[in-house]
């Protein structure tokens, strides 16, 4: 069982944390791709719309009689055959979301955490004990934690000072431990997670992995 250093907000080592092999194991890139695809599909607004024959402006009156004019027969000026007529089979508002198995999602989350660990981009802090909600001060704190690009902050409970300190920092996002998604971990360069949040997340993922192995056996 591997371990990872636990540091304080000053970057000083204050302990270590044991990482479960069931969680921080092999990386399944195919599963990560599926999870990211599903997440982005859910984010798609799907508000695109074109005007069909029913919605486009114009009267429905027949332009000229069916026979006797020598011209091609025609119905409404809103016909798709006419300029400014309705669009046929054009995009309409819809949801792009689809069902994604929970087992796959948890497996992808394990792979995302394992990938961050393998890349040396996972930092565990004892706690996000932010004294004052100051963005500049917190930016220096992140620099001390070797965050030089984008960062995902994972906290176990509501932390108002942390929220206020990080919300205006470019490239920094704060999420709760029970709401973290593989997409979040892959999107940001470094993940900084509080020890209590990692404990809860690891226990949850470890339990799910053990249950899956029991079903297979």
Curated annotation (Swiss-Prot):
It comes from the Bacteria. Keywords: Ribonucleoprotein, Ribosomal protein, RNA-binding, rRNA-binding. GO terms for molecular function: rRNA binding; structural constituent of ribosome. GO terms for biological process: translation. Gene3D superfamilies: 3.40.1370.10. InterPro entries: Ribosomal_uL4, Ribosomal_uL4-like, Ribosomal_uL4_dom_sf. One of its GO terms (cellular component) is ribonucleoprotein complex. Belongs to the universal ribosomal protein uL4 family. Part of the 50S ribosomal subunit. One of the primary rRNA binding proteins, this protein initially binds near the 5'-end of the 23S rRNA. It is important during the early stages of 50S assembly. It makes multiple contacts with different domains of the 23S rRNA in the assembled 50S subunit and ribosome. This is Large ribosomal subunit protein uL4. It comes from Koribacter versatilis (strain Ellin345). The lineage of its organism: Bacteria, Pseudomonadati, Acidobacteriota, Terriglobia, Terriglobales.
């Amino acid at each position: 069982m591997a371990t990872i250093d636990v540091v304080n907000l000053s970057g000083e080592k204050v302990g270590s944390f044991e990482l479960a092999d069931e969680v921080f194991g092999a990386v399944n890139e195919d599963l990560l791709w599926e999870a990211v695809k599903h997440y982005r599909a859910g984010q798609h607004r799907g508000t695109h719309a074109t005007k069909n024959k029913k919605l486009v402006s114009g009267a429905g009156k027949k332009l000229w009689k069916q026979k006797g004019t020598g011209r091609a027969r025609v119905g409404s000026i809103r016909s798709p055959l006419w300029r400014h007529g309705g669009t046929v089979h054009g995009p309409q508002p819809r949801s792009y979301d689809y069902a994604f198995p929970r087992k796959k999602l948890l497996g992808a989350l394990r792979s995302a955490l394992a990938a961050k660990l393998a890349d040396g981009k996972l930092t565990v802090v004892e706690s996000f004990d932010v004294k004052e909600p100051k963005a500049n001060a917190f930016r220096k704190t992140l620099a001390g934690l070797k965050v030089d690009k984008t960062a995902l902050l994972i906290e176990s409970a509501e932390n108002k000072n942390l929220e206020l300190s990080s919300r205006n920092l470019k490239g920094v996002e704060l999420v709760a431990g029970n709401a973290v998604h593989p997409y979040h971990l892959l999107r940001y360069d470094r993940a900084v997670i509080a020890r209590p949040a990692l404990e809860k997340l690891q226990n949850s993922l470890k339990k799910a992995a053990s249950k899956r192995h029991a079903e297979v056996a």
